[in-house]
Amino acid sequence: QYHTLPEIYSWLDRLVQEHPEHVEPVVGGKSYEGREIRGVKVSYKKGNPVVMVESNIHAREWITAATTTYLLNELLTSKNSTIREMAENYDWYIFPVTNPDGYVYTHTTDRMWRKTRSPNPDSLCAGTDPNRNWNFHWMEQGTSSRPCTETYGGKKAFSEVETRSFSDFLKTLKGQIKVYLAFHSYSQLLLFPYGHTCQHTYNHDDLQAIGDAAARSLAQRYGTDYTVGNIYDAIYPASGGSMDWAYDTLDIPIAYTYELRPRDGWNGFQLPANQIIPTGEETVDSVVTILKESRRLGYFNTSD
């Protein structure tokens, strides 16, 4: 089943109590309504490359928090040797809900809410799209300057306390984060930078190859078919997103955005709860491959 924000946060507390030597609580920022953006750090040894997992920045995309909590649970409890290896050779920062106000609002008021909940002066419409609010090619492509739209980018870059505080937290880990994974739904896509231009990144070919391998791994279990590509070409131009900012500003070489199940459908944000576990399983399969392939290509060599 899908869980509320208090349920997710109390589960994180429980993990800290149950695994005190490997799990520590982390606050990644705060929200307009004063909630914490809470996550955990999972670490089994010193000096590991860091994998940053950001999820549910769009409030209605509930499968993302469900999938990242599934991943977190696997890292701590799985007996599978491949997953143990992945858990213990990387440091994981996992933030299941990076838009807590919006997430709560989707449970109490409007299941289809996407944005933050901050008021917009001069408008009756509330909220900014937090994945169009980051200070990297802000307001250039696939975003709107009208507050009543779903993709409103905000009155300025980092106008939202959520994106501002979370980006400040990420900056404290600059140089340590080697992999950035952002989770969205839906469309079954695995996307990499950039969203503001069709120009390829310096490691475009690697990101395409790693992504293709990850999509093959993901498909093995249930035949779920993912398309891989840079945002601009694979989905649509969209600038001001967290992944592009993290990739560019923090020099994180391996950066992907997942668009989880389903592929399409009129109610794609309301994925039936009986698909949570399968989505989690196949997604973990693909994350294993992203890390394995990135390592094989030399991205985690400590000498750089």
From Swiss-Prot:
GO MF, one annotated term: zinc ion binding
Active site feature: E259
SS bond partners: C125-C148
Domain Peptidase M14: 1-294
Cross-referenced InterPro entries: Peptidase_M14
Principal EC category: hydrolase
Cofactor binding description: Binds 1 zinc ion per subunit.
Repeat recorded as keyword: no
Residues reported in the UniProt entry to bind Zn(2+): H58, E61, H184
Tissue and organ distribution: Gut specific.
Coiled coil spans: none
Keyword Hydrolase applies: yes
Cofactor annotation: Zn(2+)
SMART domains: Zn_pept (SM00631)
GO terms of biological process kind: proteolysis
GO CC list: extracellular space
Family: Belongs to the peptidase M14 family.
Protein name, as recorded: Zinc carboxypeptidase
Organism: Simulium vittatum (Striped black fly)
